[in-house]
Amino acid sequence: MKGYFEQLKDSELVFVGYGVNAPEYQWNDYEGLDVKGKTVVILVNDPGFATKDPALFNGNAMTYYGRWTYKYEEASRQGAEGAIIIHETAPASYGWSVVEHSWTGPQFGFVREDLNKGRVAVEGWVNTDVAKELFANAGLN
């Protein structure tokens, strides 16, 4: 598809915690939320990191549910159009500079026959300071 690109304008932001739907852990951050056509804002890693409980998502060890690729895929399965991951160094296990310098320009990919339905249309990252500003501007903390 020559000239194909995605754009979201005035997309509503919905905070979805870790953005995890894991039936085997009886965990679903999307339960009761309507994210269809919206942009989800997601914490990096998985719920086990915050609790350090080894019985919950392997505790401090990141599971597949903590990976950024999973978060974009799950957001798409839930009907979101965009997803923004909030980066924090400790739970990500790498600094903001890795994110900042890994994707420093436009990102291009091939448009598959399914129009890349396995991922949200727009993917992004913000650091904690920007996330705090977003929430403050929305009247949230």
Model-inferred region functions:
Residues 21, 28, 45, 58-60, ...:
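Detector for Asparagine
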Residues 77-94, 100-104, 108-141:
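Long, well-ordered, tryptophan-enriched scaffold segments
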Residues 1-54:
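Noncatalytic luminal/extracellular "stalk/propeptide" segments of secretory-pathway proteins
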Residues 15-16, 20-22, 58-59, 104-106, ...:
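Mixed-charge, polar/low-complexity N-terminal
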Residues 17, 33, 43, 71-74, ...:
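Structured segments of extracytoplasmic/periplasmic soluble domains
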Residues 1-4, 15, 25-30, 54-72, ...:
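Second-shell loop/turn segments in exported
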Residues 55-66, 70-77, 96-99, 103-109:
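Flexible, low-complexity junctional segments that flank or bridge functional domains
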